[in-house]
Amino acid sequence: MKTTSLKPADVDKKWVVIDAEGLVVGRLASIVAMRLRGKHKAAYTPHVDCGDHVIVINADKVKFTGRKYDQKVYYHHTGYPGGIKERSAKFILEGRFPERVVEKAVERMLPRGPLFRQILGHLRVYKGSEHPHEAQQPQALDVGSLNRKNVSA
């Protein structure tokens, strides 16, 4: 049996839309990261960008399990001494850009490497139910039905 190694020209990229309403952030991000890398395909090749384009809608309606909504803290550093900043998940989700919670979760599940920025460029996250990618005819992926733990009660 011969091992298949995809060439960039042979990759068939699909468009997938995921409705994130009521889904658990970490479980959603794990599935999205797998789709972006292309690991759901039989002909996955690590050094080729063979993943799909993923659109996540209703990113402002994601859920956290336990008390993470109030207690989870996101850190970033300004680059200056003593410049560590922190924001809670609640602060971000109730702010102007709630989709950043999903973006950061997916970004941190992808491996840093030569393809990182290219793969991350195939992710589109929107806070409402509207998206401007109808022309690509994305297929709907029901993440909630894949596992009952994906949906928060």
Swiss-Prot record:
Keyword terms, alphabetized: Ribonucleoprotein, Ribosomal protein
UniProt-annotated stretches for the region Disordered: 129-153
One example of a Gene Ontology biological process annotation: translation
Protein name, UniProt field: Large ribosomal subunit protein uL13
Cited PANTHER family: LARGE RIBOSOMAL SUBUNIT PROTEIN UL13M, RIBOSOMAL PROTEIN L13
GO CC list: cytosolic large ribosomal subunit
Subunit structure: Part of the 50S ribosomal subunit.
Species this protein is from: Methylorubrum populi (strain ATCC BAA-705 / NCIMB 13946 / BJ001) (Methylobacterium populi)
Family: Belongs to the universal ribosomal protein uL13 family.
NCBIfam families to which the protein is assigned, alphabetical: rplM_bact (TIGR01066)
Described function: This protein is one of the early assembly proteins of the 50S ribosomal subunit, although it is not seen to bind rRNA by itself. It is important during the early stages of 50S assembly.
SUPFAM superfamilies associated with the record: Ribosomal protein L13
Name of encoding gene: rplM
UniProt xrefs under InterPro entries: Ribosomal_uL13, Ribosomal_uL13_bac-type, Ribosomal_uL13_sf
GO MF: mRNA binding; structural constituent of ribosome
